[in-house]
Amino acid sequence: MQIAALERCQKFRADLLLAHIFANPQTRSFQKELAENSGFSSAGLTADQARVQEHVLELLPMISEVNAVSEELNKYRHFELVLLGAATQDDNQTKVMVQMKDVGTGNLWLWERGKFMNRRYIIQEMYQQFLDDDESWKTCPKDKDPFWDEVEDYAVGTSSAFLQSLSYSLDFEDKLQITDHRGLEQGNLTIVLTPCDAKGQSLGEDDFNEDPNELVGKPYHVKVDVRDAEVYNSRFNHGLYVKYGCSFAKEAKDHHKTKVLTGTLAPSWKDSRMISIDKVTDEIIEIFETDSINFTVMAVQKPGDGSAPKVPYKNC
């Protein structure tokens, strides 16, 4: 609850900051001073937090500008800032991205900061054509239109399975909450982690160890089962799958993907994979004790028919 309240407070501050910036469109140094006066001081922040804050302050006015152009040109696209938590990133750094939404189909895209800034530049050129009564922008080919992008799979949310039970050769089974980038619940995902022998047979009760250090120097095997899920949003029924990687085994660090199941919001993948470690090290024990496997639930999106929504843009 405290985290949710903090996020609401930060969003409110961001909205206030954005209003001030547009009321006083001056220099970047002024924006920095204003940010500090609005509660965005960089004092006491980590390097990652300071970088994120700088990118947020940079992107907020750009996003507002692009949304205004989209509405003016009836492009039926809406943009918003998105923060992807460090825990879900391979480099353990928070990622600042921009989400584009097709307000007609509901399709979503996540753009890297650099891609958005490049698109914004082209959008500015398109808007200048509009202001100059140059109607060539209306016949811009789809693949040249800065508001268009290929439909791609979208991350519904992530679920984290903590690994501490593996330190004691114990099974882990849970129905985990699927959480999106806003921290909102989007469904649940059933995951099972089962320590096993080299043939994939589950360990017996006698194989339990009280001290994780007993595993050091020995081989270790674990089965990762992605069983089933329940997803709440009906627009994601075109196809659902799960992808994940395991930081404690070299051959499993790359993302493994389940099969895609279509036409359902309650997919049952029954996907099983055995991961083997040749020799447990102190580093692996540390991972077991403190880390998790992040499972990302992905949704297949379908392109629209190209027609504009039947309601005015401002009502979408």
Outline where the language-model segments fall.
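Peripheral membrane lipid-binding modules
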Residues: D48-R51, H55-L57, S70-K95, Q99-L184, ...
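Long, low-complexity, serine/proline/glycine-rich intrinsically disordered regulatory regions
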Residues: M1-A68, K75, T194-C196, G204-Y220
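Extended alpha-helical scaffold domains
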Residues: D206, L215-R227, A266-M274
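Short amphipathic, basic-aromatic surface patches that mediate peripheral association
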Residues: D225-R235
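Alpha-solenoid helical-repeat scaffolds
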Residues: A161-G217
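A structural signal for beta-strand and strand-to-loop patches characteristic of beta-rich domains
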Residues: D211, H221-V224, H255, T262
